[in-house]
């Protein structure tokens, strides 16, 4: 209340920002007459001078220089746009451009020309000479926006490229990323970053820098997509029959008897009766014994699949596959898969072929990918409801830009009915009334199932209409464009078709413009606002209204008791509704509860990913060093050799050979032979003093002797590529271990321990172990390389060329959870096979290799226990 009063007196923070930007607008406008008089060549030369000025400035002062040249850059870009695109930037669009350049989010209503606004900040920031990325939600928008704006950028002397899923050739992608301005989707940019960090040559990396990115529909990408990490993965060996068995058990269990459902948190809680039934059906005496952990996990996922996930709402079945439906856009998320075995559980539920689970090979969240950029900005029509999250997670402030023309759309109060049937009856009546009048209507639904229900009702009433949901996503832009035609009735799942303008004729404006009907409130107010925002663009007339029922998910789960009480007191008859600001406010409060739950969920995911992100950055930085030909790999190998020997000698009773028993000396001899391919006579070990120096010099001289056949360039390249392979294999194993740790970490809460604190502590220890493993594995591997002559070295180089080529061209596609067709653990022919860290130890101790011989060495001689 006090905040609102102060805001009215001195203006809000947003008002003060707009006031500052308006001063700059006056400066830009004052330059317009000067540039209008220039010829095209003179205008282009003026822009070239700006490039020279910015690029001649020291790197850390370039941002300051950009602010100095902003008025000229914006004025030239506007003049160029007038000549090339026949579009002049409005004053409010200039403000939007300045907001983007300041690394903020510009909230601009539908139809205000966000695509044109972006050109101002893009052209300005590209002056620095580093690629600027423009990020969109789908390939269609990336291609459309780049093609529309390309003539303008070319006039200004910039090159433009577009990255879409259809660009498969590596050389072509490399060429596109070399452009000054690159358009593409969030998925393409994210996966290219991951793929870059699986490359075996710096020259093959496509993303050279992360200087500046503008994210269009920023709320969709940085909020809605934030819970879905980008994952590249390979197959994991799991028994497929377990999924089917778990599905059978889940289908036989009864709600409230064998398990309860927590709809708010989308969780299943198995009762004691349910545990007994499951144990009986699985044929085990204790479902939660360690050896039955996989079964209990499969059952949890099968229960979720059968009782929390619904066909035509959360997913569809097409071409013998389970395909996810994006809960925010209603689009099909082809190629994306639920993790932790849930997708396989859905496949078992629907009786389609079950695909293997996969092991993570590389992953990153959108949060951590986009936070890498030196400067990040965004555009959307709906951001204020998530302003806190944008600021807290991304350090992005939201600035609401005034519209060029006043909004004339009428947003009517919600109408609430007792049942879904009554609600849909009322919706059909309203659609019929509008259709008879010729006024176009866009109807928003929350799921495919509801859009199909509405489709059937309209068909029954013989009202011509078009349905746009995940099943018709290929015609999305075309259908949405036609939604403003006379008499058009369009049903859209959530906000499919976002980014495509619905333009109205004067006749339609006379009829009242586009009428929006929402058939259900979404969990997020922002999605509802997006639906409303399809109407009333650029001062057009329009109307929006939501029709709700007490049976809607949002009201049923979060907010119906109070509203239901009001309806009962009013004694409403069938077909009657209530309409009041009080009720609308109650619905919005329910939405705020859900939004907060989702925010906490995304924040929780980020807290965990931040732990992995620090490790990821460290590993990727080391990878880049190894790819650099100037890196002193010889020093790294020497350091690893010293570390490996220290590990061996730290296990000896003493560092003086006189105190070593014959058995220990024999054990040392065997370890040197088996792990380091070093042949040392027992009597030499007995004579050596100090023994550590003797062994170190022996390993070093053996290695140097066999590397003599290589010239310095050959040697450096072979050593760096081999080390990269060791690093990559160890990193993949580490990610697998981290996945397993994350899966079970929440159980620590039952032991009164904070799961996040435990995760941080254990993941840190795992990372230290990972680093140690690399050092030991590296020196073992290098010790076993054999080059007897120059032919061997030439063969090795050819092998490494092929190896690098294979690694970079494995079957990687651009998906939310990638699946590689082949086993990625490629080993050089010359190396002895070492078990994976999580495989059973070959010594048959019953322990995992990492907990056994990987630490202590073979069970003989020196390390016998």
UniProtKB/Swiss-Prot annotation:
Example of a GO MF term: ATP binding
Binding site for Zn(2+): 841, 843, 852-853
Enzyme Commission number(s) from the entry: 7.4.2.8
Alphabetical GO biological process terms: intracellular protein transmembrane transport; protein import; protein targeting; protein transport by the Sec complex
Cellular component annotations (GO), alphabetically ordered: cell envelope Sec protein transport complex; cytosol; plasma membrane
Keywords annotated in UniProt: ATP-binding, Cell inner membrane, Cell membrane, Cytoplasm, Membrane, Metal-binding, Nucleotide-binding, Protein transport, Translocase, Translocation, Transport, Zinc
PROSITE patterns: SECA, SECA_MOTOR_DEAD
InterPro entries in the cross-refs: Helicase_ATP-bd, Helicase_C-like, P-loop_NTPase, SEC_C_motif, SecA, SecA_CS, SecA_DEAD, SecA_motor_DEAD
Note describing how the cofactor binds: May bind 1 zinc ion per subunit.
Class of this enzyme: translocase
Entry's family note: Belongs to the SecA family.
Function: Part of the Sec protein translocase complex. Interacts with the SecYEG preprotein conducting channel. Has a central role in coupling the hydrolysis of ATP to the transfer of proteins into and across the cell membrane, serving as an ATP-driven molecular motor driving the stepwise translocation of polypeptide chains across the membrane.
Protein name (database record): Protein translocase subunit SecA
